Amino acid sequence: MERSHLYLPTLSYAAMGHVYAPYRGSSSPALSTASSTSSKPEQIEELVSQQLHHLKMHYADEEQRYVDQMLLENPIVVERRAPPPLKTELAMDCRGSGSGSGSGSGSDVKDAQRQRAESCRKSRYNNKIKKAKLRFRHKFVSGQLKKSAVMLDTMRDVIAQAERQLLERGYPAATLERMRATFGLEMEQ
């Protein structure tokens, strides 16, 4: 048998991360049952849907781990706003003591202000966390997209190299075109 001299770069699931690695052996009950019985279209569809669900869940876990790690590495800092000027506090004290209602209303106003300030601080902190999480998720998805694009380009190069070698060995070009049409590669060039 003639040996092929295709240059195959490291095409493995390890380069893409273990997220995309298919099940090996009989670790998946769905695979072992599907392979032991005859392959019916319903079983294949169920197996594909289970595999897609597994991949989606694993991808979501990877994304969440990445976001959590980035939040740990880049803690969110919320600066405290400057306290209000003393003139405002003095004017409020003068109005509050001039009304003659006692010190109860002044402390109620200060408590309400303190609670509002604390609520605003929490809200600003939560908003900053949400923005950071979105930024890190976007960074993760962009990185995954770049990896996928690199893998796709590599596969295109391997296919083009294989086609060139087949043509050099005398394989009919019409058959290659038919194969391209069958596998949906006619739009790639």
Swiss-Prot record:
Involved in sex determination and dosage compensation. Required for proper expression of Sxl in embryonic somatic cells. Also has an essential function in the yolk nuclei. Involved in endoderm migration and midgut formation. Disruption phenotype: Homozygous embryonic female lethality. Hemizygous embryonic male lethality. Mutant embryos fail to form the midgut due to the failure of endoderm migration. Consequently, the yolk is left as an unenclosed mass that moves to ectopic locations as development progresses causing a variety of terminal phenotypes. Its main location: nucleus. One of its GO terms (biological process) is endoderm development. Keywords: Developmental protein, Differentiation, Nucleus, Sexual differentiation, Transcription, Transcription regulation. The keyword DNA-binding does not apply. One of its GO terms (molecular function) is DNA-binding transcription factor activity. Changing residue 128 to E: In sisA1; embryonic female lethal. GO terms for cellular component: nucleus. This is Protein sisterless A. Homodimer. Interacts with dpn (via bHLH motif). Interacts with da (via bHLH motif). Interacts with Bap60. Residues 93-124 are annotated as: Disordered. It is found in: Nucleus. Localizes to all the embryonic nuclei until nuclear cycle 9, when expression ceases in the prepole cell nuclei. Associates with the somatic nuclei through cycle 10. By nuclear cycle 12, distributes uniformly in the somatic portion of the embryo and no longer associates with the nuclei. After early cycle 14 (beginning of cellularization) there is very little or no expression in the periphery of the embryo or in either the somatic or germ cells. In the yolk, accumulates at the nuclei from nuclear cycle 8 until 10-11 hours after fertilization. Residues 108-121 have a biased composition (Basic and acidic residues). The keyword Plastid does not apply.
